[in-house]
Amino acid sequence: MIHGLLGRKIGMMQYFTKEGRAIPVTVIAAGPCIVTQIRTPERDGYSAVQLGYEEVEARKLTKPQQGHLKASGGKMLRYLREFSADDPLAHKPGEVVTVELFKPGQKVDISGTSKGRGFAGVVKRHGFRGGPKTHGQSDRHRAPGSIGAGTTPGRVWKGQRMAGRMGGDRVTIQNLEVVEVLPEQNLLLVKGSVPGARNGLLQIRKAVKG
């Protein structure tokens, strides 16, 4: 069995359980994905299954990408990602992998690109408290304060939390519960929120710690 799938975030909604309890869920359009390559220890040094997702016109891909995909079934696919599998050699290029890979109640890890926030200060970016609001304070309400000592070390330490570009990073949220699987619509409902904006690409994997 392959341990993951590619999909797109559709949005969030309320889901009512059989007990009548409302829980927040994220709706994900997961798959179908196509197996495009099998990685083997003899040839590649590791085992994995490469999946392709989302058909696209050939002109939008480079010649090497087109050649790679023609050798594995001919469908032109926008995204290629690799996933581990119980037995990679049990799968063949061209095989279709659907959302039925997952079951309700299962735990999954979901990775995506977080929303970009642009240049942000330390209060928003790192949760700094800021300076005092009164007693003569005039313009340092959201300033970081001191960023280091004096002569020793005479520099700012690497990794010092400062203002800068926020968001747009790869983020993984672990152990999200699968609430419902809808194979006919290729939809996956998971409890809680997932990284990124609507329509963002997601990698859904079997939970490592679940």
Swiss-Prot record:
GO terms for molecular function: rRNA binding; structural constituent of ribosome. The keyword NAD does not apply. GO terms for biological process: translation. Keywords: Ribonucleoprotein, Ribosomal protein, RNA-binding, rRNA-binding. GO terms for cellular component: cytosolic large ribosomal subunit. The keyword RNA-binding applies. It comes from the Bacteria. Residues 125-154 are annotated as: Disordered. Belongs to the universal ribosomal protein uL3 family. Part of the 50S ribosomal subunit. Forms a cluster with proteins L14 and L19. NCBIfam families: L3_bact. This is Large ribosomal subunit protein uL3. It comes from Chloroflexus aggregans (strain MD-66 / DSM 9485).
